[in-house]
Structure formats: structure tokens, C-alpha cells
Curated annotation (Swiss-Prot):
Belongs to the GRP transporter (TC 2.A.7.5) family. Keywords: Cell membrane, Membrane, Sugar transport, Transmembrane, Transmembrane helix, Transport. One of its GO terms (molecular function) is carbohydrate transmembrane transporter activity. It is a multi-pass membrane protein. It comes from Listeria innocua serovar 6a (strain ATCC BAA-680 / CLIP 11262). The chain crosses the membrane at residues 2-21, 31-50, 55-77, 111-133, 146-168, 172-194, 207-229, 233-255, 262-284. PANTHER family: TRANSMEMBRANE PROTEIN 144. Pfam families: Sugar_transport. One of its GO terms (cellular component) is plasma membrane. This is Putative sugar uptake protein lin0444. CDD domains: GRP. It comes from the Bacteria. The keyword Membrane applies.
Length: 285
């Protein structure tokens, strides 16, 4: 029972992370810097407690994956700033799932059977349909797509980098808690570089506030590590993706976005399709 509660940490942590980041009007760069600082502090504490062995290879690979995360997370924050948490996060989650799936098929040559291909293709289609449905908005007597191509472009590019962040360690077979510290160092190094390149004043209050964003992300990350060790990749992966429910519905309610009954129907149906697609993908892991 307790391990399933731990498995809910990614759901809550990753679900509330973008909501926390947008409770205060910070720039995406400030959000990224605060999140990265908090992630590194959390990583140092875990390293001190667990003392995992870090090799030169695991450090370099994890450091690079942290850089990918920073670019991806910055673009995700930008996508949210250009739309909203409720609109951007289903696109982000859905396209990350599709990206990771394509990488698994093309690079790791998964889906070796016809059945696997059919299940995988159906899963991807369901996820993509679900993503589009969450962005529908009622205008007059018509339902239209409310998310602009500009936002789609930003979030999809974000998902490309976040997919690289996820698969880089897998590609080099770097696993376990040895990932966390060098990855966090890479995250903060890149975040500092991005803020220096911007050459504009940084609000210390905004960065400090976003330490909570980083704490939310770090708790989710730790929960995913612990849940995967006990429940396995398929189960923990499926549970963690419910974060899209928290981010989407939480974003609408907390930021008091008005939705008509028809819009709620499309949003909830879209989320349901995404989660069904996730379950199908978990069958292939």
C-alpha cells in the first residue's frame, strides 16, 4: 500500500509543478533557475544520504541529460506563458510520450511483433487525438482548436529536448541514483548560462519562489525512482502519467478559467484518451 502512495508522488509533483511555477509572475528563465537550484540542493541531500557510485561515464551522460532537461523545461515554461497550464501540459505530456515511444521503436527496436505494432500505433493515435481534444474551445455555436500553431511549435520542441533528457541515460545504460546529482549539476549549469545569455535583470524573489517548483519536481523524480524499483517500469510509468490530470484540471480550477460543459466534456475525454494510450504503451514495456 505504501509503495502505491509513493508512486503517487510523481502524479502530484509533476502535476503541481507547472501550477506552482505560475502562481507568481516570473519569467520562464527565472522559473528555470529557481527549479534547477532547488533540484541541485535536493540532489546533494540524496547523494549525502545514499552515496551512490558515480563513474566518469555516468557523470558525463547524466550531465548532458540535465542540459537537455533545461532546454526542454525552458521551452515548456515558455509554452505555458504563451497559453496556460491547462492548454500546454496535455500537449507536453502527450508529445513526450509519443517522442519516447518513437525513440524506443527506432533506436531500441522495440515492438518486435505485429501485435506490439498494432497496440503501439493505436496508443499513439489515441494520445494524439486526446492532446488535440484538450485544446478545444467553444466560440459561439462552434468548437474550435484554441491552441495556436506557435504554442504547439514551442511545446513540441520542448518535448523533443525532454525526450532526449529521458532517453540519454537509457541509451548509455546509466541507471539508478547515480544519475541524480550530475544531472542536477547539468540542469543548473545550463540554467545559469541561459540567464546570463539573456542579459536582463533577474528577480531574486521570483527565483526564490520557484525553489518550490524545483522541490515539487524533485519529490516527483524521487518518487519515480522508488516506485520503478519496486513496481517496475510499466506500472510506475502508467501511474506517473496521471500528472496530466492534475496539471490540466488543477490549472483550470486554481487559475479560475471558465469552461462550458461542452468544453469540459472535450477536456475530460481528451485526458481519458491520453491515459488509455498510456495504459496501452505500458503493456509493451
Amino acid at each position: 500500500m505504501s509503495i502505491y502512495l509513493i508512486a503517487l508522488l510523481p502524479v502530484l509533483g509533476w502535476g503541481f509543478m507547472p501550477i506552482i511555477a505560475n502562481l507568481r509572475k516570473s519569467t520562464p528563465e527565472e522559473q528555470l533557475l529557481g527549479t534547477s537550484i532547488s533540484a541541485l540542493l535536493f540532489a546533494f541531500i540524496l547523494f549525502w544520504i545514499l552515496s551512490p557510485e558515480i563513474t566518469v561515464l555516468s557523470f558525463i551522460v547524466s550531465f548532458v541529460s540535465g542540459i537537455f532537461w533545461s532546454f526542454g523545461q525552458l521551452l515548456q515554461f515558455k509554452g505555458i506563458a504563451a497559453s496556460s497550464v491547462a492548454k500546454a501540459m496535455p500537449i507536453s505530456n502527450g508529445t513526450q510520450l509519443v517522442g519516447a515511444t518513437l525513440f524506443a521503436v527506432l533506436v531500441f527496436q522495440e515492438w518486435q511483433t505485429v501485435t506490439a505494432v498494432i497496440i503501439g500505433v493505436v496508443a499513439v493515435i489515441l494520445i494524439l487525438i486526446g492532446v488535440v481534444m484538450t485544446g478545444f474551445q467553444k466560440r459561439g455555436n462552434h468548437i474550435t482548436e484554441s491552441v495556436s500553431f506557435h504554442v504547439y511549435g514551442i511545446v513540441i520542441l520542448s518535448s523533443f529536448f525532454l525526450t532526449l533528457y529521458v532517453v540519454t541515460n537509457q541509451l548509455f545504460d546509466v541507471t539508478g541514483f547515480s544519475i541524480i546529482l550530475p544531472q542536477a549539476i547539468g540542469m543548473l549549469t545550463c540554467a545559469i548560462g541561459i540567464n546570463l545569455a539573456k542579459k536582463t535583470a533577474i528577480s531574486r524573489k521570483n527565483v526564490t519562489f520557484n525553489l518550490m517548483t524545483g522541490l515539487s519536481w524533485s519529490i516527483a523524480n524521487l518518487g519515480m525512482f522508488l516506485a520503478t524499483a519496486v513496481l517496475g517500469v510499466a506500472t510506475s510509468f502508467s501511474i506517473s502519467q496521471a500528472c496530466v490530470i492534475v496539471a490540466t484540471i488543477g490549472g483550470i480550477l486554481i487559475f479560475k478559467q471558465k469552461k462550458s460543459p461542452l468544453e469540459w466534456t472535450f477536456i475530460l475525454s481528451g485526458i481519458l484518451l491520453i491515459m488509455v494510450g498510456v495504459v496501452f504503451l505500458s503493456l509493451l514495456k
